[in-house]
């Protein structure tokens, strides 16, 4: 489609919405035009630059949508036996940007199932997911006061409605090399593993700087487009994401909802799987984490932080029998039909 944009005389006082309607512009092009037009009316160069950056972002998203619509299906991998369960709370611009990049990456590379549980004070912030055509998305929006972040509950509510044999507890800020997704699903389906960490234990994490060129990445979703100097090497062991046999994940209690907010639930989860004698394995490859600003939802500044640590210490001291008894009788399971 070769559409040439005319130049507008701002003195003619044309209403922006009128322009968008007359040109029959879609969501992304409409917003790009809006920001371009209003940028010329700003009093300072900084204000003008912000609008031009916004226009650039919407144009990049439009390019991505067109890429997705014309993508080579031979390059889209089949993960239809897997469901990604992704808890989301868009409490910052960084988190929104990461959601665009991560979900766009999954959409570019896989045909798969995704359940998103979004906590929000009002309307959904994920205004782009309808363009992700390769993902079969179930988007749950929960209006919440956001006094605290109960991520473990979000995950269990999604886990309870998963219909595929493989499920992935997935962080909205991470991506993996494409082969790691394929190998992890294979290990679960073949019965070799009950749970798979799709990254190595050690210096396998690459933290992506806030200052990397996101517009370039969001066009082709190519990990090679991220400059090495903007990748920081960190250790990885827990968190990020984990592939699981759906039935066994449910059988051993899913997520422990007594952990509220930021805490050691990632460590507890691995310790539980090992104590209860499940087969846990790893794919020794990298995990890429998009950095984001830290809020009360992603640091230890919470009234629940100390109780979370005490619960972790209690559970870590349990043997097979005491842990089995605990998770067989834990109260939160009563809410979910598949957990009983």
What are these regions (language model features)?
Residues 177-257:
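Conserved catalytic core of nucleotide-sugar-dependent glycosyltransferases
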Residues 79, 94-98, 236, 258-340:
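C-terminal catalytic/acceptor-binding lobe
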Residues 1-73:
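Intrinsically disordered, low-complexity regulatory regions
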Residues 162-165, 254:
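Active-site acidic short loop of glycosyltransferases
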Residues 145-161:
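Glycine-rich, basic loop-to-helix element that forms the pyrophosphate-binding segment
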Residues 165-177:
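Short beta-strand-to-loop acidic/aromatic patch adjacent to the donor-nucleotide binding site
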Residues 72-105:
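N-proximal low-complexity "stem/linker" segments adjacent to membrane-targeting elements
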Residues 103-143:
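Acidic donor-binding segment of Leloir-type glycosyltransferases
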């Amino acid at each position: 489609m070769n559409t040439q944009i005319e130049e507008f005389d701002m003195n003619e006082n044309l209403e922006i919405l009128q322009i968008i309607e007359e040109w029959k512009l879609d969501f992304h092009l409409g917003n790009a035009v809006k920001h371009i037009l209003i940028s010329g009316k700003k009093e300072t160069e900084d204000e003008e630059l912000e609008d031009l950056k916004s226009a650039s972002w919407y144009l990049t998203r439009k390019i991505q949508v067109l890429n997705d619509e014309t993508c080579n299906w031979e390059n889209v991998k089949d993960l239809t036996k897997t469901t990604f369960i992704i808890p989301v709370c868009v409490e910052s611009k960084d988190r929104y940007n990461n959601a665009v990049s991560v979900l766009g990456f999954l959409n570019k590379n896989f045909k798969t199932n995704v359940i998103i549980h979004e906590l929000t004070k009002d309307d959904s912030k994920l205004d782009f997911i309808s363009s992700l055509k390769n993902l079969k998305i179930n988007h749950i929006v929960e209006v919440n006061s956001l006094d605290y972040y109960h991520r473990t509950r979000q995950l269990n509510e999604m886990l309870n409605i998963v219909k595929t044999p493989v499920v992935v507890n997935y962080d909205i800020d991470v991506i993996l090399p494409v082969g790691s997704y394929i190998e992890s699903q294979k290990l679960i389906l073949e019965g070799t593993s009950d749970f798979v960490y799709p990254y190595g234990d050690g210096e396998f994490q690459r933290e992506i700087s806030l200052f990397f060129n996101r517009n370039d990445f969001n066009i082709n979703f190519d990990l090679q487009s991220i400059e090495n100097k903007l990748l920081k090497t960190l250790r990885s062991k827990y968190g990020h994401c984990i592939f699981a046999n759906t039935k066994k994940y449910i059988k051993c209690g899913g997520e422990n909802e007594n952990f509220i907010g930021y805490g050691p639930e990632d460590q507890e989860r691995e310790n539980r799987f090992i104590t209860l004698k499940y087969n846990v394995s790893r794919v020794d490859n990298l995990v890429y984490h998009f950095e984001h600003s830290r809020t009360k939802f992603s640091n230890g500044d919470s009234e629940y932080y100390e109780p979370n640590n005490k619960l972790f210490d209690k559970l870590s001291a349990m043997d097979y029998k005491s842990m089995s008894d605990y998770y067989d009788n834990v109260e939160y399971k009563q809410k979910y039909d598949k957990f009983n």
